[in-house]
Amino acid sequence: MADTASKHIDMTTGSLWRNIPLFALPVAATSILEQLSNLIATVIIGNFSGDQGTLAMAAVGSNVPLTSLMLNLFIGMSLGSNVVIANAIGRNDQNMVKRAVHTSILMALVGFAVIALGEIFAEPMLAALNVPAETMPLASLYLRVFLLSMPSILLYNFEAAIFRSVGITRMPLQALAVSTVLNIGLDLIFVPVLHWGVAGVAIATAIAYTVSAATLFIRLLKTDSVVRVTPRDLAIDPVALKRIVKIGLPAGIQSAVFAVANIIIQSAINSLGTEVMAASSAAMSLECVCYNLLNSFSQACTTFVGQNHGARQIDRCTKTLKVCLVEGGVVALTTIIVIVGLGREILSLFNSDPNIVSIGYIRVCSIFPAYAFIMLYENMSGYLRGFGISLIPALITMICVCGIRFYWVFCVFPHFRTFANIMMVYPISLGTTAFFMVVAVLLCHPTRTYRATQAKATAC
């Protein structure tokens, strides 16, 4: 096996204009592959489930906000691992790297608790989303089976965060590429051939993620890099755990807040009927792919800033943000032009019903232009997290996203019960969040604060 350490990206030296895309693009490709299997599963469900195609699509789509809530909350913790390990690498603190790596692996065990809680409360949680009675049996079945994959999903994401903290981004991509092919193959067997429907899609996901998590674990056992895992050293280190939770928990809450707000919105969408649910589900799949493309630059910003902060290269931290904003802006503009321009054609791949395509296109035109705001607040929050400032972005997101979307659903939507109306809340809430995230960076000014702290320490 090739030494994975030789393939790492040096974050503290070299051209940021070159190294950030080298880091971000494999991360984006990994995230897109994660969504690709979901996209293809939606297509397979919609086209190979016979008369229940639209109902099955609605069942899977109605679960997206709920599964996103659980995944975002715990996967956000992996961002804490990323920052802590990257910062320790920048400081050349190999002891902390070792402790944080082994602590991170064991933190994924929380996935088993999620399974237990989810299996008990599956139907009540779906009922809270106003899932229609005709959709409930399939939606509940999908959720119960999907939750079995939670430990593998969490383990994979913690392992990926460990590799990325040292600049190895292709390894998680390679592992997921193999499991994605497996996932698609199993979907094609379980749904059209065995007629397992939504349960087949969920089972395929569980098997595929188990393979990818096992692959990365084996790689961590064999790697020659500083993040090598030794089974006898697997233990929860209190200091490492505290640092990871301090950064990761607010990051997880920040991600979960979006999911909570989307659950409220999904509840309003569900009240408009199965056809609207199916159309929204198809458009939502596109959003997940494009969002992850932009989010990869935020992850790059966090990791690069984390390492350079540890190495005390503060000017390079500021330049990292500037590069991520420019390159992320180009990606956002391209995404907006392509998806809005070809939206109807792309949506028709999910479901050929003209009415569903038209409804889905309303969502496309409402949300995708706001991707400029997403690019802005993601990079700003990623920059702050790289300095270990994680609570402020979480609070801004909670107030701006949850506050505005809750108000809209409960105070505005009841008076104008249309799909177009509920979609208007997205650009409004995203724009407000971006504005206050920029203000937070300007007020916190972490580079100036760092220099002032260093000057004070030197004077003493």
What are the residue ranges of the model-derived segments?
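N-terminal transmembrane alpha-helices
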Residues: M11-V43, N47-D51, P65-G80, V84, ...
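Transmembrane helical elements of multi-pass membrane transporters/channels
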Residues: L22-T42, V145, Y156, S179, ...
